[in-house]
Amino acid sequence: MIPRSCLRVRTLLTALILALFLTWTLSRWHLKAYILKSTGLSSHSPTDLTPSHHKFWQEFHSLLERHAPNTPPIVEYEKAKTASFSAHDPPLRPDTIYVPEDEIAIMKEAHTGFVNAITKSPPDLPYITGTKGIVSTAGGFYLPVLVISLRMLRRTGSTLPMEVFLADEQEYEPYICDTVLPSLNARCVVLSRILIAAPAKIHKYQFKPFAMLFSSFEEILFLDADAFPLNKPEHLFTTDPFLSTGLLTWPDFWASSASPIFYQIADLPPPPMDLRQSTESGEILLSKSSHTRSLLLATYYNYHGPSHYYPLLSQGAAGEGDKETFITAATAMHEPFYQVSEPICALGHPIPGGMAGSAMAQFDPVHDYTLTSRGVWRVKGDNAPAPAVFFIHANYPKFNPATIFEDHAVNPVFTDEGEYTRAWTIPEHVVQAYNARGDVEKGFWEEVLWTACELEDKFESWGGYQGVCEGVRDYWGVVFGSD
């Protein structure tokens, strides 16, 4: 028999442990509530669409397989040269891929069958009517980069919810997904929990359209993990050109390199090479209610991308992947879209003989549309003030605090002499224009510093790194300490 005194001690210890647990739980809840209140955000807890997504994916996966281009993969071909876009002196459309006529006919039949199926009776795509939000993909090395971009988004005052798609359970980091992201009105979505309904081999570079498909939002702004806006993006949803089209994209540096064979398969006339630039898909605005079919066809191109449609749409030129699939799909489905005409701008710092370019500036679509709707095309040489910079896509190398100070092919934070430098100082007129609202790069590094120091021991991908916070503090002190 246990003495009564021991029973009393055990009861008291149990009560104490329970009280401590409740206090810890309440403190976490109050901390999260305080963060949300202080930032003006509300926690994003949408209706669970997983059962509906399972049903949709089973039906849609069957459709993707039924209309697969059942021909050998396109793997052996001369890579097309990457040609810059010119509205005045466009290059010829490259034609480097050879596909036998009988295989073209098979692919055309499959493409036509898929288009007819989604035209007549598309699968019911689940989303919450009337919602708007931001969608991204991350995980592993990209998760710290995403947090920095998300904090830059919140600096604009935007309260749009965000859904961050991860590949699988291994990429789900509990502290980041359960504490950090919810405090910024964002949540993690594990893609494999949806795709398990009809298992398929989908690689990370194919994830973008799947994240867009399975987001809960009706209208989405997709942003790559390393892209962020300089202004609140809310108004983009409620003004032209998005309001009148339902699909908005931004340009890349290059001319189109889509193969003439693709246009045979899609039964479309090849567009003139001076019509528009190729697409830089780090930023996409899309309405599912108006462009479900375009999104379904873009997903078809990506699902069969590595074997067929990536080569057909780029022929191995720079950036081959999902970038050309979105407006190509809209064209094939005869659905409207608007691609910003203002040329993309490389940002960097000077080095002997050129620039260490580590980011890209994309411009305000509303300003751009105001010009083009009046017949003013700066890309064709018309004289007009430039639209404002709206997005910065800090794409190469990734500004991950754990690795940014390592040696890279492009070194954004070092001069050729090995001294610390600002990353984005040229073109001066572009940098001066967007800095009129405040020092953008300094603000960016404030978020890099916060992420490095507040979350140094939180990211699983940083487990093997030492001195992440210290490295960023050193850089900050030299470059911004006297500002």
Regions found by a protein language model. Name each.
Residues I2-D483:
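Glycosyltransferase catalytic domains, chiefly GT-A lineage
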